Amino acid sequence: MGFWGRNSFEADKKHILVTGGSQGLGKAIAKELVLRGANVTIVARTVTKLQEAVAELSDSKIHEDQQVSFESVDLTSYESVHSMIERLPFCPDHVVHCAGSCIPGFFTELDPSVFEKQMRQNYLASVYVCHAAIRRMKEISPSYSRRILLVGSLLSSLPIIGYSAYSPVKAAVRNLADSLRQECILYDIEVSVYLPSTILSPGYEQENTLKPELVLQMEGMDSVQTCEEAASHCMTGLDRGDFLIANESTGHLMKNHCRNSSPHDNPILEYLFALVSLLAWPFYRRKLDSLVYQYALEKGYRQPSSSRNSWIFTLLLTFTQLTIFYLSLNCLIENPYRMLRNTFPIWFIMQTLQIYIQSPRPPLTPKRLLAGAASMLIGSLLISFILVAFGAPLLHDFHLTYFCALTLSVFTVYPLASTLAFNTEQWQRFLTLKSFNVIGSMQLRSWGPIIGAWFGAFPIPLDWDRPWQAWPITIVIGAFLGYAFAAIVGEILQ
């Protein structure tokens, strides 16, 4: 009944039906119930597994007259489920529906029959068990609280790639629990739903043989629990009278992120979880999306694409950099080396922000940042040699030449290296001006400083004898003007 009217979960001497109780989480929950003195009937399809499970569970009995039995039933057949529950010598006090299966795979690579099978094994089996059980349970009104527990999945609140046949039906199971919770008030029956995350079970091991490499990679970030640990968390939630039960921190965050109209079990704590998930989820989602995008590029599923929603940020950042450069202009004329040295960290930080916002996914990571920074340093040396080849000082004022090259590199090599990495095909497209559809205005922003610096070199040899003609002032000014012009034109074209 949730926070305002929760009932305790009584198991001792009660008759409890556990579907999916022959192995995995179902058997672990059944064992917890047996240890509490319950009379447990486990339900599954394979008789040999049921017999082995009953023998194992019987060793945990705490009462001499305690009963542990099994029923072999096809839960995807309503006639079989209804017949089984009707012929039980007792009316179930509690029902734990843990049966189900998961068939992972990419949506387009799964046969349509898989979706039908998942619907039958996960959702319709839940409907059949609940329907037959409630019809019998409503005929009596005991003095103690009764409970129906549906085992769903965290994937009902956090669906990810590879589970398009599984996540939707588990979401349907959760919604079924929401509907039954209110309707079962008519019969004084409590309803709860358990949303566990990854559990080490026989089913999980079988799933791993079917999962695409990407799904295994994404799940490598998750915490994993044994069936016994997950069963213990489930029992704790039942003891508290919770409606939505989770077994780890991500589950608590996501169940509150997607709570909808479900009752609150602990409002203060759950509002806090909801706030944290509201703030954290966009970053976590972007991380997951980035893994998918990178996988798509590596496997050739698609071509890179540029971000289309960063034009305001790009123009704002360009204006900010241009303003800082304008305010530093006198310093550039008076002491070019000091200005270039002191402003370099500013350009580096701003370009890092620009890369993160606009570069094709995946977003900036420490590894990509280091690769881009290393390429920037190497690029600055190459640009220095190019400048020297065109007449820049080699021995005298080489420090000016190098910091001019480093400034050019942070606006050209750094964003490109962080975005294109070591993809030679994309570098060829950039050099041949064919990658605008890939990196958008970044292509123009990279060419802009180069062209601007080239034009900026024109006034240096002229006999005007002006302070701003000193090396490499006009080249730096031209590079910044070229960058600003290219950024504006690039965003307009994009």
From Swiss-Prot:
Give GO cellular component annotations, separated by semicolons: endoplasmic reticulum membrane
The family database entries (Gene3D superfamilies) matched by this protein are listed as: NAD(P)-binding Rossmann-like Domain
Q: Per the record, what are the reactions this protein catalyses?
A: sphinganine + NADP(+) = 3-oxosphinganine + NADPH + H(+)
Identify the residues that bind NADPH.
Answer: 20, 22, 24, 45, 49, 74-75
Listed A to Z, the keywords are: Endoplasmic reticulum, GPI-anchor biosynthesis, Lipid metabolism, Membrane, NADP, Nucleotide-binding, Oxidoreductase, Sphingolipid metabolism, Transmembrane, Transmembrane helix
- Residues of the active site are 166, 170
Molecular function as annotated in GO? 3-dehydrosphinganine reductase activity; NADPH binding
Q: Which residues form a coiled coil?
A: none
- Which residues bind NADP(+) per the record? 25, 54, 166, 170, 199
Bilayer-crossing residues are 148-168, 264-284, 312-332, 370-390, 402-422, 444-464, 473-493
Function according to Swiss-Prot or TrEMBL:
Acts in the GPI biosynthetic pathway between GlcNAc-PI synthesis and GPI transfer to protein. Required for the formation of complete GPI precursors CP1 and CP2.
Spell out the family assignment given in the record's similarity comment.
In the N-terminal section; belongs to the short-chain dehydrogenases/reductases (SDR) family. In the C-terminal section; belongs to the PIGF family.
Protein name (record): PIGF/3-ketodihydrosphingosine reductase fusion protein
